[in-house]
């Protein structure tokens, strides 16, 4: 007879098997009404699943993260229910949960229009408002296959044939006349699935293979209540205003074009931001004692075969040939850095050796995945590799962690989630090697009192890694930084040093990137600041404007003076009204506008305005220069008088 232990340590004794819903009802009708699922001995189960033995039980509600994920998954099934009613010949493929929502890939003999999506969402609401029960049945593999074969669901049959063992018992979930297959759990009743919205459609190949049929992917978002849904939609609206592609065009930062998909054409102002970011990173490299190097753009395929990249990464690599030799354009910098390390005999006294590069890399990303600066084919990594002894690993990883937090704080990013990615199925190196590498990273994080979670199986094929995900002002996650141990690549490329015992040893290699892709990070910053870059990063920091022609000479003198002081400044001497000039440069997000009239010429001062519309009044020119230099030098996120 099961004894159920609840999270508060209390126990309930039963003389028969019980479900999480039974226990919730036993505790109280309010909890039963809120019960979505249960966690039994750490495993999520449906509210109706029976517990036959002693167990630890937590009741999952919409307030739990798992509860929200279940709601989203059930909304995907609701979408399937609705689309089969509207277009009965639709074939259903897969419908997983994603960040903030769900999607379903469908095979439909018509291209869905916006009107179709609206009709589909309306039908989903009509069905959800019926508050029908979702019925779960565990059936044999053969019964599941027969069920979907009879319904013409060829994609579900394919999943059963290729992904589910014949002795398994798949879970079928019945939404009235509609049936879907899933590991679950799902909501017990559709009253939990009232707060959703369909967002967009896109194309997607079956199983992600371009050789397969193109399906239609329908994206949706779902939340536990109306307030949360509306808040999310408002964040999306704000995100659209901050879209770096839109702002990049408004501020003339860069452009992309069809002749070079995924490659950035940097304009002067955008390249100014890029170079200023490089200056900042270089200052940190000097502070943390890195040396900067530059490797070639492409190397012989033979080298990439030695590293293991060719076997694991060749589909993402661009290749070319010359004089009967095949070359790979580098997708990453690490093999080149090992070649530099290998030049000349190294001693243990030379370690740690910290080698950094602004490496120009190229990856053959699918054209459909390209997205402005966020997903490109040609990008620059703020990449570094540290060669060290095993005894130095902990100190070096600690240094990397400090550098990550040091740099992110400069941009105002405070919420950082850390994950430790462990060995994937497809990997190089021994299990003992992976055990040691994973333990070293975990200990370094623990010593820095940094909370982290494991991502099982998500490491790179050559070593485990720490991933740093920062959250922006809209609470969107951006995975940028990595610190990754590699016990394999140096030995593959014959890297060695002479140890204290005068024997040759293989160094440990630590891969380290903080901003990740410079292009992507500029995209993130553009959206984080909505184009209002902090003064130190702004392409033009000051515009000096005249009111009439009589102040032109004074404006030119001031422009030269500020430029000599290291400030990026422009003069606007156009024969336009001063209000027009101020509005134009405000729209260009120029941090400071200095206005010069006859009064300013006579007094040797300037009238200072910020792009936020704040009038700082008349100020001495030297005082303005001194304050701006301090703001720029300190890389402050705030402007004067803020």
Swiss-Prot record:
Protein family according to the UniProt entry: Belongs to the class-II aminoacyl-tRNA synthetase family.
Biotech applications: A number of inhibitors with high affinity for bacterial ThrRS and less affinity for human ThrRS have been identified that might make good antibiotics.
The protein's assembly and partners: Homodimer; binds 2 tRNA(Thr) per homodimer, each tRNA contacts both monomers and makes specific contacts with the anticodon and acceptor stems.
Binding site for tRNA(Thr): 309, 325, 348-349
One GO cellular component term: cytosol
Cofactor binding description: Binds 1 zinc ion per subunit. It helps recognize and select the amino acid substrate, and thus has neither a purely catalytic or structural role.
Region named Catalytic: 243-534
PTM sites of type N6-acetyllysine: 286
Chain spans, region Correctly edits mischarged seryl-tRNA(Thr): 1-224
Phenotypic effect of disruption: Essential, it cannot be deleted.
Region (N1 domain): 1-62
Gene name as annotated: thrS
Annotated phenotype, changing residue 180 to A: No longer edits mischarged L-seryl-tRNA(Thr), mischarges tRNA(Thr) with L-serine, correct acylation is unaffected
Name assigned to this protein: Threonine--tRNA ligase
EC number of the protein: 6.1.1.3
């Amino acid at each position: 007879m099961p004894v159920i232990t609840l999270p508060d340590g209390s126990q309930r004794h039963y003389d028969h098997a019980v479900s999480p819903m039974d226990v919730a009802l036993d505790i109280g009708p309010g909890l039963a009404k809120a019960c979505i699922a249960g966690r039994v001995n750490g495993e999520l189960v449906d509210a109706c699943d029976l517990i036959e033995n002693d167990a630890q039980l937590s009741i999952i509600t919409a307030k739990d993260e798992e509860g929200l994920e279940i709601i989203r998954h059930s909304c995907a099934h609701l979408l399937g229910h609705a689309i089969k009613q509207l277009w009965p010949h639709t074939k259903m493929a897969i419908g997983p949960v994603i960040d903030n929502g769900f999607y379903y890939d469908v095979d439909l003999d018509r291209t869905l229009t916006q009107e179709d999506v609206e009709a589909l969402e309306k039908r989903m609401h009509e069905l959800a408002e019926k508050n029908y029960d979702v019925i779960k049945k565990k059936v044999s593999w053969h019964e599941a296959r027969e069920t979907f074969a009879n319904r013409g669901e060829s994609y579900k049959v394919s999943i059963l044939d290729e992904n589910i063992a014949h002795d398994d018992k798949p879970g079928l979930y019945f939404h009235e006349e509609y049936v879907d297959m899933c590991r679950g759990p799902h909501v017990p009743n559709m009253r939990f699935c009232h707060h959703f919205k369909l967002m967009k459609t896109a194309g997607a190949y079956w199983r992600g293979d371009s050789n397969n049929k193109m399906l239609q992917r329908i994206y949706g978002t779902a939340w536990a209540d109306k307030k949360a849904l509306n808040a999310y939609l408002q964040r999306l609206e704000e995100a659209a205003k901050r879209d770096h592609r839109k702002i990049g065009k408004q501020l003339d930062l860069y452009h992309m074009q069809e002749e070079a998909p995924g490659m950035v054409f940097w304009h002067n102002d955008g390249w100014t931001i890029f170079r200023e970011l490089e200056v900042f990173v270089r200052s940190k490299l000097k502070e943390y004692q890195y040396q900067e190097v530059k490797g070639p753009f492409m190397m012989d395929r033979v080298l990439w075969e030695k590293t293991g990249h060719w076997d694991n990464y060749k589909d993402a690599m661009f290749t070319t040939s010359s004089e009967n030799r095949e070359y790979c354009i580098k997708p990453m910098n690490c093999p080149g850095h090992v070649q530099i390390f290998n030049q000349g005999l190294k001693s243990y006294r030379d370690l740690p050796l910290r080698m950094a590069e602004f490496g120009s890399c190229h990856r053959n990303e699918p054209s459909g995945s390209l997205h402005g600066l966020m997903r490109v084919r040609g990008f620059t990594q703020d990449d570094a590799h540290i060669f060290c002894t095993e005894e130095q690993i902990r100190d070096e990883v600690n240094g990397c962690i400090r550098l990550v937090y040091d740099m992110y704080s400069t941009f105002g990013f405070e919420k950082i989630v850390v994950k430790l990615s462990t060995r994937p199925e497809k990997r190089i190196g021994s299990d003992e090697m992976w055990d040691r590498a994973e333990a070293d990273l975990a200990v370094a994080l623990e010593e820095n009192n940094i909370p982290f979670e494991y991502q099982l199986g998500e490491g790179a094929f050559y070593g485990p890694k720490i991933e740093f995900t920062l959250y922006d002002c809209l609470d969107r996650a951006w995975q940028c930084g990595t610190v990754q141990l590699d016990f394999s690549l140096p030995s593959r490329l014959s890297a060695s040093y002479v140890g204290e015992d005068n024997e040759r040893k293989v160094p440990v290699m630590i891969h380290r990137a903080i901003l990740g892709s410079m292009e992507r990070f500029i995209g993130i910053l553009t959206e984080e600041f909505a184009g209002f870059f902090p003064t130190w990063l702004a392409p033009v920091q000051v515009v000096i404007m005249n009111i009439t022609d009589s102040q032109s000479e004074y404006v030119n003198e001031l422009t030269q003076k500020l430029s000599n002081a290291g400030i990026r400044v422009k003069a606007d001497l156009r024969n336009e009204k001063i209000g027009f000039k101020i509005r134009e440069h405000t729209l260009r997000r120029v941090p400071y506008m200095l206005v010069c009239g006859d009064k300013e010429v006579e007094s040797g001062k300037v009238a200072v305005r910020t792009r936020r519309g704040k009038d700082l009044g008349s100020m001495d020119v030297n005082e303005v220069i001194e304050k701006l230099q301090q703001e720029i030098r300190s890389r402050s996120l705030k402007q004067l008088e803020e």
